[in-house]
């Protein structure tokens, strides 16, 4: 029996696996999927009993027509190999195909229900398309008939500025590139060097469900739903339906139809504008003619201008005739009024008025003589003296009355206070905390006693409680303290 080292037996196993199987196809359900930072894709293919580890290297990930997704039933093609350092075998996959359209349709239906539950298909989310966009952004492959059809149709209908964002329209790179293109157009600023489009078109020609699968990826649907720019989806033919069709603002059956939705026909628009202009001119001409005829009808109903001025001219003539007499009468009335107002200003009247004012001033001056002031001061002094005497008498009476009330209250306090009771032979007992003791049991429990008599206080120590004895008969003349 030959003897092998670990490295030797691992190498033999690797050579046996690779030589015996070579390139193989394996059918199973995709399990765990993980893409490393390096770009390599690691996943499992499993059935109800076993699991096969698979790897797709970074350079081959982009060429996959279907990206492995957990739960998807696929057929993978690759080469079986072994890793001696880990004692594991692995399938290096370079091609992934869906095991059947039924699996893809089930996955598509699952995604549709999820996105619909989130409200991404709601009609109220869909925005109207701009009537005549200035700039149209097209997301598609830069080669092929799709972009040529769109540009040709736009040029025929109404030439617009078009920005093309080239993307892969199938394969593993399709979904991330389309999502990045939608997000990228939305990041353009309206006034930037590269202006922001007013409308987006995501377009691709027809193909199998596997070819169109990139437009069924969740990342594409969410990017289209989040777009702030109105978006038309034109993926596949009229019978092809993808997830992006449900979240876009409008769905076009073909890329050519998307271009027709985007812009009106320029010639039709010019013809319509010309027709509307002609209608407006005819309407304006008719309106002017109607107004002119109406003006002529109204002018015939008006009187002649000369007849309108006859009556005012007669009133003016009569007023001119009365004007000189009216001026003379006005001057006479003003003269009479002036004479009436100037009568009190005669010299005799002025002298009488001045004399009366002098007599009044003399009377006032006599009241300000020194003797009159002395008499007034003396009278006010006597009045002040009388008021001072009355105030002193009232204060003395008030003070005496309050003193008597205070003495009476003090006598009542002494009568009702416990000091008077102490003077009759009673005492107040407190503990060392100053609390009042009213029973023998309280006094027995106290650590120290403080006894207050009428003439002072005595401090004494406490004593244990003694058995209760028959109380002595109180003297009949001694009353209760409380």
Curated annotation (Swiss-Prot):
Its main location: cytoplasm. It is found in: Cytoplasm. Its EC number is 3.1.11.6. Pfam families: Exonuc_VII_L (PF02601), tRNA_anti_2 (PF13742). Keywords: Cytoplasm, Exonuclease, Hydrolase, Nuclease. One of its GO terms (biological process) is DNA catabolic process. GO terms for cellular component: cytoplasm; exodeoxyribonuclease VII complex. It catalyses: Exonucleolytic cleavage in either 5'- to 3'- or 3'- to 5'-direction to yield nucleoside 5'-phosphates. Residues 457-482 are annotated as: Disordered. It is an enzyme of class 3 (hydrolase). The keyword Cytoplasm applies. Heterooligomer composed of large and small subunits. Belongs to the XseA family. Bidirectionally degrades single-stranded DNA into large acid-insoluble oligonucleotides, which are then degraded further into small acid-soluble oligonucleotides. This is Exodeoxyribonuclease 7 large subunit. It comes from Ruegeria pomeroyi (strain ATCC 700808 / DSM 15171 / DSS-3).
């Amino acid at each position: 029996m030959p003897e092998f080292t670990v490295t030797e037996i691992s190498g033999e196993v690797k050579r046996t696996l690779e030589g015996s199987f070579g390139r193989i196809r394996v059918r199973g359900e995709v399990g765990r999927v993980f893409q490393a930072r390096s770009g390599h894709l690691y996943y499992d293919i499993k059935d109800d009993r076993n699991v096969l580890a698979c790897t797709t290297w970074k350079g081959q990930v982009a060429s996959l027509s279907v990206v492995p997704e957990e739960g998807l039933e696929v057929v993978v093609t690759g080469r079986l190999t072994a890793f001696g350092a880990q004692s594991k075998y692995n399938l290096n996959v370079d091609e992934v195909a869906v095991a059947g359209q039924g699996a893809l349709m089930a996955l598509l239906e699952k995604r549709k229900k999820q996105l619909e539950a989130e409200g991404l298909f709601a009609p109220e989310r869909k925005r109207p398309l701009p009537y005549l966009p200035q700039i149209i952004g097209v997301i598609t492959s830069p080669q092929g008939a799709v972009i040529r059809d769109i540009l040709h149709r736009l040029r025929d209908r109404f030439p617009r500025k078009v920005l093309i964002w080239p993307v892969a329209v199938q394969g593993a790179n399709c979904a991330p590139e389309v999502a990045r293109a939608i997000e990228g157009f939305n990041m353009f600023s309206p006034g930037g060097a590269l202006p922001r489009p007013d409308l987006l078109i995501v377009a691709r020609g027809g193909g199998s469900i596997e070819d169109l699968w990139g437009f069924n990826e969740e990342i594409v649907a969410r990017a289209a739903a989040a777009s702030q720019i109105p978006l038309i989806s034109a993926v596949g033919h009229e019978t092809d339906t993808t997830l992006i069709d449900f979240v876009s603002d409008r769905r076009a059956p073909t890329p050519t139809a998307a271009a027709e939705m985007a812009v009106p026909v320029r010639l039709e628009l010019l013809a319509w504008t010309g027709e509307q202009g002609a209608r407006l001119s005819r309407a304006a001409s008719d309106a002017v003619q109607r107004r002119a005829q109406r003006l002529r009808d109204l002018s015939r109903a008006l009187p002649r201008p000369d007849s309108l001025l006859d009556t005012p001219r007669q009133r003016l003539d009569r007023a001119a005739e009365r004007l000189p007499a009216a001026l003379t009468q006005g001057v006479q009335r003003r003269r009479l009024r002036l004479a009436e107002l100037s009568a009190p200003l005669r010299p005799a009247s002025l002298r009488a008025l001045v004399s009366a004012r002098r007599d009044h001033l003399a009377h006032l001056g006599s009241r300000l003589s020194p003797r009159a002031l002395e008499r007034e001061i003396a009278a006010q002094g006597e009045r002040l003296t009388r008021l001072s005497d009355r105030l002193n008498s009232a204060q003395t009476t008030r003070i005496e009355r309050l003193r008597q009330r205070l003495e009476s209250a003090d006598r009542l306090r002494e009568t009702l206070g416990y000091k008077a009771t102490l003077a009759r032979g009673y005492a107040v007992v407190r503990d060392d905390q100053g609390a009042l003791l009213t029973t023998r049991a309280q006094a027995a429990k106290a650590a120290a006693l403080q006894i207050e008599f009428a003439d002072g206080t005595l401090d004494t120590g406490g004593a244990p409680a003694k058995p209760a004895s028959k109380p002595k008969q109180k003297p009949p003349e001694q009353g209760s303290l409380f």
